[in-house]
């Protein structure tokens, strides 16, 4: 799986076991991701942070 880094078009190949790409947003600025990468389990959203996860190449 290939996931975008914080600034596309840069991306990386995920290590074994991390089969999801994710984007993390601050709830106050939902249009600007603050973190992107590979992850094994999609984290739960909180009052301050929202996660968007997906499982296809460079979908984040």
Swiss-Prot record:
| Biological process (GO), any one | killing of cells of another organism
Task: Say yes or no: keyword Membrane present.
Answer: yes
The UniProt entry, under Pfam families, shows: Toxin_cobra-type (PF21947)
Q: Which GO terms describe its cellular component?
A: extracellular region; membrane; other organism cell membrane
Which compartments is it annotated to reside in?
Secreted; Target cell membrane
Q: Name one GO molecular function term.
A: toxin activity
Tell me which tissues or organs this protein is expressed in.
Answer: Expressed by the venom gland.
Cystine links in this protein are 3-21, 14-38, 42-53, 54-59
Q: Which domain of life is it from?
A: Eukaryota
Q: Which UniProt keywords apply?
A: Cardiotoxin, Cytolysis, Disulfide bond, Membrane, Secreted, Target cell membrane, Target membrane, Toxin
- Which CDD domains does the annotation name? TFP_snake_toxin (cd00206)
User: What InterPro entries has UniProt attached to this entry?
Assistant: Cytotoxin_Cobra, Snake_3FTx, Snake_toxin-like_sf, Snake_toxin_con_site, Toxin_cobra-type
What does it do? Answer: Shows cytolytic activity on many different cells by forming pore in lipid membranes. In vivo, increases heart rate or kills the animal by cardiac arrest. In addition, it binds to heparin with high affinity, interacts with Kv channel-interacting protein 1 (KCNIP1) in a calcium-independent manner, and binds to integrin alpha-V/beta-3 (ITGAV/ITGB3) with moderate affinity.
Q: Which family does it belong to?
A: Belongs to the three-finger toxin family. Short-chain subfamily. Type IA cytotoxin sub-subfamily.
Note the subunit structure. Answer: Monomer in solution; Homodimer and oligomer in the presence of negatively charged lipids forming a pore with a size ranging between 20 and 30 Angstroms.
Name by which UniProt lists this protein: Cytotoxin 4
Native source species: Naja annulifera (Banded Egyptian cobra)
């Amino acid at each position: 799986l290939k996931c975008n880094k914080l600034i596309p078009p840069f991306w990386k190949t995920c290590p074994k076991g991390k089969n999801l790409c994710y984007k993390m947003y601050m709830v106050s600025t939902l249009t600007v991701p603050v973190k992107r990468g590979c992850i094994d389990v999609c984290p739960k959203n909180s009052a301050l942070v929202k996660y968007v996860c997906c499982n296809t190449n460079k979908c984040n």
